[in-house]
């Protein structure tokens, strides 16, 4: 789960991580009032959406007086911001962060992520702050420094100091930088984050180490023990189809292709997408109906897939272990009738009650193409979609 920058900074502040003072605003008048309350000579007006690249898209403005705060708030609020992370459709700006300006001396990058290769949290840092870390990794990987953290003991002070020296934090500010990184790590672990990214981390003219931006992502599977974080969820920032899928315990991720996929099991779902790509097709989604899908869940899964106007055909690929193939077959038929499906539909069933499932499909009288294997199914749906 993602949260907004201002929310992330509030979480970090509670762990002793230094962030600029700021207030959220939902209207132009609230933005002006927030700037008045901050009482600083310079304010930064920042669009709040769940995407990076806001500055380049015109969503971050420096205001030197209240009139400029009003002007920028009017120009940003209610507009659709298109960045490299939003896709061409962009995201509507419904709230702003009004933040005190600061005298930036140098920008850095600091982030914590899970390294799946080592099964450890890794602290990454670079003195190339303010730019996309992926770009730094591609062009100048030698400028990224890493510390792998033993989960038994956590981030150690010497590791944070080594990072601070490697990215050339001024010696007199190393102590602050270490405290910053230790607080960031505590927030990451205690709040079950999957990403904690500060870009940029800055040193200021008055000798402070501060997070100028904050991106926190949380493990959705751990939200049951973080009610305070769950309350920060902004449904307006999420894909409507993903929200609908979550109501039925369906795992759905939209993609850019035109072949809808309905599969049980994440591994099989990824293999299905791979084989569709192998035969020169493009999957429109990842959709895992799970191991205990009912006919109702299958019907809802169809509706979600078909709500994507780019979908030109559907491939259902089910291995019946916990889930029985006859239940899936009944769900497919019910869904096809309910939604009035006119698109090509290829179904591959294997496992528990597979013969009964195939019999139900064959006797349905519907235009359903049966596949004998995953390869056969992928080839057929790619051919039908054209």
Curated annotation (Swiss-Prot):
Pfam families: ATP-grasp_2, Ligase_CoA. Pathway: Carbohydrate metabolism; tricarboxylic acid cycle; succinate from succinyl-CoA (ligase route): step 1/1. Keywords: ATP-binding, Ligase, Magnesium, Metal-binding, Nucleotide-binding, Tricarboxylic acid cycle. Substrate binds at residues 264, 321-323. ATP binds at residues 46, 53-55, 99, 102, 107. Residues 9-244 form the ATP-grasp domain. Succinyl-CoA synthetase functions in the citric acid cycle (TCA), coupling the hydrolysis of succinyl-CoA to the synthesis of either ATP or GTP and thus represents the only step of substrate-level phosphorylation in the TCA. The beta subunit provides nucleotide specificity of the enzyme and binds the substrate succinate, while the binding sites for coenzyme A and phosphate are found in the alpha subunit. HAMAP family: Succ_CoA_beta. This is Succinate--CoA ligase [ADP-forming] subunit beta. The gene is sucC.
């Amino acid at each position: 789960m993602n949260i907004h920058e201002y929310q992330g900074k509030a979480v970090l502040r509670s762990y002793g991580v230094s962030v600029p003072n700021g207030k959220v605003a939902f209207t132009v008048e609230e933005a002006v009032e927030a700037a008045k309350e901050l009482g600083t000579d310079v304010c930064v007006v920042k669009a709040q959406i769940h995407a990076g690249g806001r500055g380049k898209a015109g969503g971050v403005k420096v205001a030197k007086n209240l009139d400029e705060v009003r002007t920028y708030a009017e120009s940003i609020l209610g507009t659709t911001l298109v960045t490299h992370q939003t896709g061409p459709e962009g995201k509507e700006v419904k709230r702003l962060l009004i933040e005190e300006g600061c005298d930036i001396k140098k920008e850095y990058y600091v982030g914590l992520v899970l390294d799946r290769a080592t099964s450890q949290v890794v602290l990454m840092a670079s003195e190339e702050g303010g730019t996309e870390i992926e770009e730094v990794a591609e062009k100048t990987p030698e400028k990224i420094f890493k510390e792998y953290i033993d989960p038994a003991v956590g981030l150690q002070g010497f590791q944070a100091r080594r990072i601070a020296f490697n990215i050339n934090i001024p010696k007199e500010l190393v102590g602050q930088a270490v405290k910053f990184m230790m607080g960031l790590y505590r927030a990451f672990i205690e709040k079950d984050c999957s990403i904690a990214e500060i870009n940029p981390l800055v040193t200021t003219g008055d000798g402070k180490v501060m997070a100028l931006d904050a991106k926190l992502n949380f493990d959705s599977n751990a939200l049951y023990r973080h009610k305070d974080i769950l309350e920060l969820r902004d449904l307006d920032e999420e894909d409507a189809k993903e929200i609908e899928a979550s109501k039925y315990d369906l795992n759905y991720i939209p993609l850019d292709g035109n072949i809808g996929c309905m599969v049980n099991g994440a591994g099989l779902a990824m293999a299905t997408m791979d084989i569709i790509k192998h035969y020169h097709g493009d999957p429109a989604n990842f959709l895992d109906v799970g191991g205990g899908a009912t006919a109702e869940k299958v019907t809802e899964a169809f509706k979600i897939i078909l709500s994507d106007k780019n979908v030109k055909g559907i491939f259902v690929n089910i291995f019946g272990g916990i889930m029985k193939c006859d239940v899936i077959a009944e769900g497919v038929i019910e869904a096809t009738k309910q939604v009035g499906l006119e698109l090509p539909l290829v179904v591959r069933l294997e496992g528990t009650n597979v013969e009964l499932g195939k019999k139900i499909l064959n006797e349905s009288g519907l235009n359903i193409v049966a596949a004998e294997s995953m390869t056969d199914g992928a080839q057929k749906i790619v051919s039908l979609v054209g």
